[in-house]
């Protein structure tokens, strides 16, 4: 352990101001983080009157030397950093040297510690802002104990913001839960008013971490927990997706993000999670999760917020796409069946059946299936870009994977990798093919196209009126709802897949086509849309690419067995290697 030093004025000026102690849970958080930084294996926490009377945190870490006790409770004194460059590579919870000084300023605090190099423990006592301290020897095992009494005794205005003891206790309990879920190898014992409230036993094996999860949140059914474990170069993502045991909105959501074992509030990670789930179930906030992201410490900036609960990623786009694709990939491995990018069913492999942490229970599948079958819940459960599903025949029994999207190239193409082969895929053509398959699948399965209102007035002749009259039922089947008068017709709705087209031009062309054909059939309309619909998108990003590839996996995975030349082109790596070798 490095000795505690006073930070230079130039270094302390570069550090974001530390957290103001606002409530007992703030004290608990700071003291627990200090114990973890001291490599403690056992931590005892005790509170009286929800921490307002007394807070005690005792650990068996490496302790503090006698001559450093006064420094330990001084402002801007720390063993974690000593130069400006250290701020770019922080591997500890604390680094500002302000925690104990801030706690000392608003309480009567006693610090007792025995270092690994000493046979005698020493204590130091301080009250509020007073510079008077009392140092004396005392019996204590190796480690540190901090007793915080009469919190805010000298700042009574702070007490006015304390709602009640119960709410403060719940905040303390939440703080301890967050620490327990990121430090599996530590025994944590929590006492409330001298009675053991909860204990979290240390987890020594990685595959037993889920038991800590169950201890922390005992309402969780492990049959509804899906484990996430992905890696990309020096970045790893581990954690759990937690589904409610019933699809009830009353299930308490748990949304915890950890970066390098530090609990953080990070909208980037949450956005990646929500958007990946939106691809599956059509609801961004319908699941709970606990995720642990690990990456080199020099890739993040912790020194931006007093609580250190907010961080900044230096390469945020990479982090976003890694988390986004990792969750989709994990769902694939458990054979998630994509249904129009909005909901999922699941079939279990033998591995899934034998490992609760890797899979969802079949009960969840049956509940989802049951909800899917209820007509009155279609709109809530399945909302597609194109159709309202009303036929179970739409569910397919295969799940196909054709490779991994690496990067987006020149805004329109994606670099794919599969089975030692690199290929370029055209996103615009892929999107058009998917729309064609959707349309054919809908008509084949008697699906009702989803529509949207669009006012279109078209003047017609007597002959054209007769043609439309003969084709009204077929047009309605495709979502064209029109009011036919003697000399004109008024179009009220059109199918939603036409929404992004140049409608005035397209509709005029469409009805001219009908007047020319006179009698039209389903295949005529499908063929016309196949050749006429344009995919008007100026550029594609990585997320767009993932979305269209997911649609291909569901609607038309067989297209990659013999792909059109303009859809997919393999890159001849051997030719390139020959050139490079020369």
Curated annotation (Swiss-Prot):
Protein name (Swiss-Prot/TrEMBL): DNA mismatch repair protein MutL
Highest taxon in the source lineage: Bacteria
Function: This protein is involved in the repair of mismatches in DNA. It is required for dam-dependent methyl-directed DNA mismatch repair. May act as a 'molecular matchmaker', a protein that promotes the formation of a stable complex between two or more DNA-binding proteins in an ATP-dependent manner without itself being part of a final effector complex.
GO biological process, one term: mismatch repair
Classification via NCBIfam families: mutl
GO molecular function: ATP binding; ATP hydrolysis activity; ATP-dependent DNA damage sensor activity; mismatched DNA binding
Keyword DNA repair: yes
Matches recorded under Pfam families: DNA_mis_repair, HATPase_c_3
Keywords: DNA damage, DNA repair
Gene: mutL
GO cellular component: mismatch repair complex
InterPro entries for this protein: DNA_mismatch_repair_CS, DNA_mismatch_repair_MutL, DNA_mismatch_S5_2-like, HATPase_C_sf, MutL/Mlh/PMS, MutL/Mlh/Pms-like, MutL_C_dimsub, MutL_C_regsub
Family, similarity comment: Belongs to the DNA mismatch repair MutL/HexB family.
Keyword Coiled coil: no
């Amino acid at each position: 352990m490095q000795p505690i030093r006073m930070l230079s004025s130039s270094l302390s000026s570069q550090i974001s101001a530390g957290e103001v102690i606002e409530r007992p849970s703030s004290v608990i958080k700071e003291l627990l983080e200090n114990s973890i930084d001291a490599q403690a294996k056992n931590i005892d926490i005790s509170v009286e009157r929800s921490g307002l009377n007394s807070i005690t945190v005792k650990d068996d870490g490496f302790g503090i030397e006698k001559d450093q006790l006064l420094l330990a409770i001084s402002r801007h004194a720390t063993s974690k950093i000593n130069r400006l460059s250290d701020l770019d590579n922080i591997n500890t919870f604390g680094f500002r040297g302000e925690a104990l000084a801030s706690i000392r300023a608003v309480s009567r605090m006693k610090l007792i510690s025995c270092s690994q190099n000493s046979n005698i423990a020493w204590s130091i006592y301080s009250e509020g802002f007073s510079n008077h301290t009392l140092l004396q020897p005392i019996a204590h095992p190796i480690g540190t104990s901090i007793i915080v009494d009469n919190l805010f005794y000298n700042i009574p205005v702070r007490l006015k913001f304390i709602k009640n003891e119960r709410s403060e206790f719940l905040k303390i309990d939440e703080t301890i839960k967050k620490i327990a879920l990121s430090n599996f190898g530590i025994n944590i014992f929590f006492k409330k008013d001298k009675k053991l409230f909860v204990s979290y036993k240390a987890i020594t094996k990685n595959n037993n971490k889920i038991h800590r999860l169950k201890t922390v949140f005992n309402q969780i059914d492990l049959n509804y927990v899906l484990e996430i474990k992905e890696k990309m170069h020096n970045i790893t993502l581990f954690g759990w997706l937690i589904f409610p045991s019933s699809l009830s909105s009353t299930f308490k959501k748990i949304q915890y993000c950890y970066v390098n074992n530090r609990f953080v509030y990070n909208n980037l990670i949450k956005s990646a999670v929500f958007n990946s789930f939106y691809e599956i179930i059509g609801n961004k906030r319908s699941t709970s999760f606990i995720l642990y992201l690990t990456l080199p410490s020099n890739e993040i900036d912790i020194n931006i917020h007093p609580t250190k609960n907010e961080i900044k990623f230096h390469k945020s786009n990479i982090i976003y796409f890694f988390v986004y694709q990792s969750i989709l990939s994990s769902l694939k491995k458990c054979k998630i069946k994509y249904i129009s990018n909005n909901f999922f069913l699941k079939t279990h492999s033998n591995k899934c059946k034998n490992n609760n942490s890797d899979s969802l229970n079949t009960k969840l599948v049956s509940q989802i299936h049951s909800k899917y079958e209820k007509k009155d819940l279609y709109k809530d459960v399945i909302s597609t870009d194109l159709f309202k599903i009303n036929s179970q025949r739409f569910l397919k029994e295969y799940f196909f994977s054709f490779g991994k999207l690496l990067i987006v190239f020149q805004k329109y193409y994606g670099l794919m990798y599969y089975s030692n082969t690199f290929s370029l895929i055209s996103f615009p053509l892929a999107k058009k093919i998917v729309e064609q398959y959707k349309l054919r699948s809908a008509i084949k399965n008697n699906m009702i196209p989803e529509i949207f209102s669009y006012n279109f007035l078209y003047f017609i002749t007597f002959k054209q009126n007769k043609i439309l009259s003969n084709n009204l039922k077929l047009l309605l089947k495709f979502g064209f709802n029109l009011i036919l008068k003697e000399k004109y017709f008024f179009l009220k709705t059109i199918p939603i897949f036409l929404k992004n087209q140049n409608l005035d031009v397209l509709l005029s062309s469409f009805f001219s086509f009908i007047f020319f054909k006179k009698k039209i059939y389903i295949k005529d309309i499908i063929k016309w849309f196949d050749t006429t619909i344009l995919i008007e998108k100026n550029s594609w990003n990585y997320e767009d690419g993932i979305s269209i590839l997911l649609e291909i996996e569901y609607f038309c995975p067989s297209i990659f067995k013999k792909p059109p030349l303009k859809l997919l082109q393999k890159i001849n790596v051997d030719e390139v290697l020959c050139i490079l070798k020369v």
